[in-house]
Amino acid sequence: MWKEKVLEYENQMIEDLKGLLSIESIRDDSKATADAPVGPGPREALDYMYNLGKRDGFSTHDVDHIAGRIEAGKGEDVLGILCHVDVVPAGDGWDSNPFQPVVTDNAIIARGTLDDKGPTIAAYYAVKILNEMKVDWKKRIHIIIGTDEESDWKCTDRYFKTEEMPALGFAPDAEFPAIHGEKGITTFDLVQNEVTEDTDEPDYELLKFESGQRYNMVPDYAKAEVLVKENMTDVIQNFENFLQQNQLQGESTVDSGILILTIEGKAVHGMDPSLGVNAGLFLLKFLASLNLNKSAKDFVEFNERYLFESHFGEKMGMKFHTDIMGDVTTNIGVISYDKEKAGRYGINLRYPEGFKFEDAIDRFRSEINELGFNLELGKVQKPHYVDKNDPFVKTLVNAYRNQTGDMTEPYTIGGGTYARNLDKGVAFGAMFADSEDLMHQKNEYITKKQLINATSIYLEAIYALCVED
């Protein structure tokens, strides 16, 4: 029944999704204003969703242009559907323009198709279809739309300062059948205190190093500028050997006596950096083989001591595992060095329940202080957990099982979704076991089958929660 109903809306749903995907809704603080707190792109995407809601007869409510909601239904309790319309940077290597959606016979290709514009449109259409069926609502629905999920969550922080907290809700921003637990998440910077003067003349000077754009992405590109005072040919040959030994792609060029080295890696979501290839850490690994200036030497040796090939906090002394939530993970997402300003590592740490986070951070801070580094801690989000046997979770999972026949149990993840804003919130789709997970990667896409099936599941789940209940 539900899938047949969704198929009636397929063409319109894809057109609405294409419109949302065409908006380059990347956070841009350089263009932030009071009317666009995280930049014009996210604001445009937020307005786009409001306009869809108004077109379809829903009321909308804006919260300082950084978040808002589309309202449906009636009743005392509220079901929250927590979506986001901001996206991570596209990165390099796409086969098409990431913000000019390509629709094939089977799929839609663009940045945000999986994370989280495709699922947002699927959930929206589930509510739209039920509303146009003129069902007898027993609950209100707030489709809550954020614009800063990929960075600092300023959107939901602001929203829930003044707006009603849903009694229960889900975020369509992960996998089916349901995610009932999420690791704690924080970001922190490891900042080199000061530039150290050299007592001896170094053979090589690291002038500049850049890698990564987001703490929650594995960097797929790194670039270093090195002043080479002798043996330029040997350094280039050693670099080529390093690339070959590590099965990496990269380039070396010389510009006015400056050697420019680049490495390409593989970008993946920072919740499991072991699945990617961190271009920045590999390039630092090579630079450690050179007799660099003192500050640069200290910086690259820090990588070797604490970061390189240590995805689970082993070298930081933070290794920890639970059967329910898994391992601590550490993603080194943003790396920079400047000869005049020294260096900085930006890290995304995710940890399960039971990990003594504050103790671990305090110990590590003391340890690296002795090496000339400070730890600057950012926002901390504690682990989130809802019992998988809760009736709400069971209702969602039953909708999934009815539509798919798959009896997979709910599970926990290292990712963080808006679901953790709610006491009783879970992540619910929109990826399936056979979906190719290209979140935060090039050539991100959603299949038409996935879009239709996810919308059908949301239809049944929302009907069970807000009409039958």
Curated annotation (Swiss-Prot):
Cofactor note: Binds 2 Zn(2+) ions per subunit.
Cofactors required: Zn(2+)
InterPro entries in the cross-refs: Bact_exopeptidase_dim_dom, M20A_pepV-rel, Peptidase_M20, Peptidase_M20A
Residues binding Zn(2+) 1, per UniProt: D115, E150, H440
GO molecular function terms noted in the UniProt entry: acetylornithine deacetylase activity; dipeptidase activity; metallopeptidase activity; zinc ion binding
Residues at which Zn(2+) 2 binds: H84, D115, D173
GO biological process: L-arginine biosynthetic process; proteolysis
UniProt KW keywords: Dipeptidase, Hydrolase, Metal-binding, Metalloprotease, Protease, Zinc
Active site: D86, E149
Record-listed E.C. numbers: 3.4.13.-
One Pfam family from the record: Peptidase_M20
Record family assignment: Belongs to the peptidase M20A family.
Family annotation (PANTHER family): ACETYLORNITHINE DEACETYLASE, N-ACETYL-L-CITRULLINE DEACETYLASE
Identification of the protein by name: Putative dipeptidase SERP1310
Annotated organism of origin: Staphylococcus epidermidis (strain ATCC 35984 / DSM 28319 / BCRC 17069 / CCUG 31568 / BM 3577 / RP62A)
Lineage: Bacteria, Bacillati, Bacillota, Bacilli, Bacillales
